[in-house]
UniProtKB/Swiss-Prot annotation:
Homohexamer. UMP binds at G54, D74, T135, G136, N137, P138, Y139, M140, T141, T142. It comes from Dehalococcoides mccartyi (strain ATCC BAA-2266 / KCTC 15142 / 195) (Dehalococcoides ethenogenes (strain 195)). Residues 20-25 are annotated as: Involved in allosteric activation by GTP. One of its GO terms (molecular function) is ATP binding. Keywords: Allosteric enzyme, ATP-binding, Cytoplasm, Kinase, Nucleotide-binding, Pyrimidine biosynthesis, Transferase. Pfam families: AA_kinase (PF00696). Its EC number is 2.7.4.22. Its main location: cytoplasm. This is Uridylate kinase. One of its GO terms (biological process) is 'de novo' CTP biosynthetic process.
Length: 241
């Protein structure tokens, strides 16, 4: 069994991770596959917290450009993350993994309110904790929520799972085939180069709190195991050069 480098992790799953090849919404087999990968690292003794996006259902910033009030659009996006969180919770529990969903929005019928100390206690008991509802504030992305929650629960690393993108490149590899992969960057380099790893607010939070980030392809075989074991995978962003 691989040796664990990161005992407590925050895994950021974008909404795109939920839609599989369907292009929109939720692809149940894809979600169950993700749950199976998460189960693997749980059984290794890793404490797992997850922040989910909602872009497979709704994108607040895009809706705002279409004329919808930005605050209302962002709250709708938060509700989309709750849908994804409940779907992932079900998939994890079908794998035998005890899971708790905490939401930054009050939806007491389906999720606990976000309470940091309670979340940490769940993790210490071996439960997976899914954070939904973003930060609970409009104008804040789920990447910022991921950075914030990772810092609050004192995670050892923030794992940014991407769809069919195996790290951070000098340019968009889909548009620029000549683009090269960064194996390592400092937080400041990622900010200064405007590489769109995540939004500047999230990156700044990670920089200020010296939180390492690993950007990797979720669909790559056993990528989560490689990431938590400290094996070379994707792009590592840290405070050290």
């Amino acid at each position: 069994m691989a040796e664990i480098k990161y005992k407590r992790i925050l895994l950021k799953l974008s909404g795109e991770a939920f839609k599989g090849a369907t292009g929109y919404g939720i692809d149940i087999p894809t979600v169950r596959s993700i749950a199976h990968e998460i189960k693997h690292i749980c059984l290794m003794g890793v404490e797992v917290a997850i922040v989910v996006g909602g872009g497979n259902i709704w994108r607040g910033a895009t809706a705002a450009k279409e004329g919808i009030d930005r605050v209302s659009a962002d709250y709708a996006g938060m509700l989309a993350t709750i849908i994804n969180a409940l779907t992932l919770q079900d998939a994890l529990e079908r794998e035998g993994i005890v899971t708790r969903t905490q939401s930054a929005l009050a939806v007491q019928q389906v999720a606990e309110p976000y309470i940091c100390r309670r979340a940490i206690r769940h993790l210490e008991k071996g439960r997976v904790v899914i954070f939904a509802g973003g930060t609970g504030n409009p104008y804040m992305t789920t990447d910022t929520a991921a950075a914030l929650r990772a810092i609050e629960i004192e995670a050892d690393v923030l794992l940014m799972a991407k769809n069919k993108v195996d790290g951070v490149y000098t340019a968009d590899p889909k548009k620029h085939p000549e683009a090269t992969l960064f194996q390592h960057l400092t937080h400041m380099e990622a900010i200064n180069k405007r590489l769109q790893v995540m939004d500047a607010t999230a990156l700044s939070l990670c920089l200020d709190n010296k939180l390492p980030i690993i950007v990797f392809d979720l669909q790559s075989s056993e990528s989560l195991v490689s990431a938590i074991s400290g094996q070379p995978i994707g792009t590592l962003i840290s405070s050290e050069s």
